[in-house]
């Protein structure tokens, strides 16, 4: 696999402490605030007029929760991310035409949110391992483009 045994240990150790539902909503919300052009995929979600509106939007929270639960499932198949995300890749790429760059942006935002939540526990080694994971997931999601 692309992660060492040690890196897998770091990732799983931290992930076990993550409140997936909460962090998912925060990560997707921040994506929409920090990179406003990503909002065009979520026009049906209602009020996205300000940072506060986005962060408290129930549909954003619900989709963020869904996104991070899928990410969580992917971590269980860390050595076959392409297989784990094949269906979601098809949906986002073929049906929704999401630019794969957005998957990378969301991965980077997720890393920021984890750093924010875990402080000292999110040390450089943990960050490096997670950065590999989010890059791997983004590549798996972009797979249908290649």
Curated annotation (Swiss-Prot):
The modification Phosphoserine is found at residue 44. Gene3D superfamilies: Globins. InterPro entries: Globin, Globin-like_sf, Globin/Proto, Hemoglobin_b, Hemoglobin_oxygen_transport. It comes from the Eukaryota. Residues 2-146 form the Globin domain. Keywords: Acetylation, Heme, Iron, Metal-binding, Oxygen transport, Phosphoprotein, S-nitrosylation, Transport. The modification N6-acetyllysine is found at residues 59, 82, 144. The modification S-nitrosocysteine is found at residue 93. GO terms for molecular function: heme binding; hemoglobin alpha binding; metal ion binding; oxygen binding; oxygen carrier activity. GO terms for biological process: cellular oxidant detoxification; hydrogen peroxide catabolic process. CDD domains: Hb-beta-like (cd08925). Disulfide bonds: none annotated. Pfam families: Globin (PF00042). Involved in oxygen transport from the lung to the various peripheral tissues. Heterotetramer of two alpha chains and two beta chains. Belongs to the globin family. This is Hemoglobin subunit beta-A/B. It comes from Felis catus.
